[in-house]
């Protein structure tokens, strides 16, 4: 029976990855940060099912506490480590560049150093990001493409990406980078543009919201389903030798296209409900990202299973159900409607 250690287990990717590993018979350990409120809502169903069997074990820890990370890894002695923890909002990284950079750089380095000192047989996955490329040219990006980060978040990811390669080359660690392009799901955070759109569709459809304000509608992204992408993470650590892989769909769509499909799914014209505001534009906008997953397909046997339209519809369906529950509470006088998305 294999053991996995996941940082960022309470996030979108943490949910899908831990679900996958638990279904494969793994014992899964995950880190959560101490706070005044418990934030495990995404994985509550997994906790209910697997924690009583001691197959899902959560630990309080902070990636910036290198001693704590070393002690935890040395105690667990996992077969695989997946580093998913990060301050992952690009726009927030401009507002909090120091915290974003510390988490993204020192966190990954603490884990790599713990593996080097504790057990070099542990396999390590680092969550790299397509934001590292910068989106300067409208071309398909692969593992050899030039990195040109445009945000503090992207810069921190470049550091972790290169450090993962340094430890692989210098200490013969099984350390891999998964360069994941944008991946979404019903579990996506509500401040990300895709989820902001689908949540608004559900609320507008049920009469709880009137307008949706967005930023750059022309920004193009290669959007895939998070469940497909976390399967690729696992596949990377099952190979005979470590390597880096781009995980993407190979097609790109604009924010406007996403909104159009989301609203049309419920029979609405998006142009009647969407407005733009400059305050939602990023200081150094990445306009275009498109990935080439040929290497992953050839060496891992991986390819995306979920189409763009299936992804949009899946997210809208989920948020329609969420809005329906919210409507019931509103009708019972337990909630007030929000006529526009919160800023």
Name each region found by the language model:
Residues 1-183, 237, 265, 306, ...:
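N-terminal Rossmann-like NAD(P)+-binding domain of SDR-like oxidoreductases, especially those catalyzing
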Residues 23, 30-31, 38, 61-64, ...:
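C-terminal substrate-binding subdomain of Rossmann-fold SDR/epimerase-dehydratase oxidoreductases
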